[in-house]
Amino acid sequence: MKLFGGPRYPEDIAKRIPPGQRLVKGWPVLQYGPIPRFNEAEWDFRVFGLVENEYTLSYAELKALGPVKVPADMHCVTGWTTLDNEWEGVPFRMLAERAGPKPEAAWVITHCEYGYTSNLSLQAMMDDDVLVAWANQGEQLAPEHGFPLRLVVPKRYAWKSAKWLRGLEFTDRNERGFWEVRGYHTHADPWRDERYSYEESRDSEAEP
């Protein structure tokens, strides 16, 4: 099958590639700012906001929660796709259930190093394949790919899978993050080709 004038892929591969995407080899590196240094003695991970039980975990405590492995493809808003990634980490759902989101909590803000943030609806984040991950393809994440921790949201463009994750905030407001205020889509569904904010409907407070 030929997609948008691009390369031809076998049918079983083509159906896994969203509109406007192309398959690439390797794992491209894209980021804003320098790679942060990791000091495990000073590092922590916070879950807070509109929850019944705010908590903070060390890196060792987080990794001891009962990791799982999830196979998932990755789609970058710049147009590349990689297939058959295997991620290892803790399900977001597990972290959320431990915190106990309050009824009014409808959005999650991901907080990362250097003040970077991103936003997604709680509904989207509660998918079974959403992970807080520390490994890919059986190996610890490389620093340029998010070590020590990154979010993985397979059903959204990859900027929502924020690198160098430090916290999750539950909120009742759709607060746009770093790239969202710079013109990128709130929901970022690659299968809907949701790349830019001008494509959003007037009511972007709910997941489509």
What does each model-found stretch correspond to?
Residues M1-P208:
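Structured, non-membrane catalytic/scaffold regions adjacent to prosthetic-group chemistry
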